[in-house]
Amino acid sequence: MAYAQYFIGNSYLNPLTDPKVCAVSLANVTFEPGCRNHWHIHHAKSGGGQLLICTAGSGWYQEAGKPAVSLEPGMVITIPGEIKHWHGAKADSWFSHIAVEVPGEETANEWLEPVDDASYAALESPAGEK
């Protein structure tokens, strides 16, 4: 699958596990400054979801209807299944995280609309800094 279509800006995906060998998918994802993925949902009948282990730079994580969370190295974000969210780099920083796909029953990712530029830019303003 070509994931670039689900990102604004450039990101780099480095799988850390082989799905033929390991049931848990881990990947290092690096976002260039300003890069973010689209809103998306990790669906699962049970279990599922995603963990983000922040490793470098500064980024954002946001769930639909909630304020964005500023991400820094060492932080771990737990995203249950069925939560609409997005994540990516801040405008002035590269950002990397290890993405862990939590095993579950009948899991599937649904990619949705892009995070619009105005909403993203508002996060970067001093009043919007979280």
Name each region found by the language model.
Residues 38-40, 61-62, 79, 84-91:
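Short beta-strand His + acidic residue motifs that chelate non-heme Fe in jelly-roll/DSBH
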Residues 28-32, 43-61, 100-102:
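Short, conserved beta-strand element in jelly-roll/cupin
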Residues 1-25, 108-130:
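A short, N-terminal "cap"/entry segment at the start of jelly-roll beta-barrel domains
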Residues 21-22, 46, 66, 92-93, ...:
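Short strand-connecting beta-turns/loops that link adjacent beta-strands
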Residues 65-82:
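Short acidic-glycine-tyrosine-enriched beta hairpin
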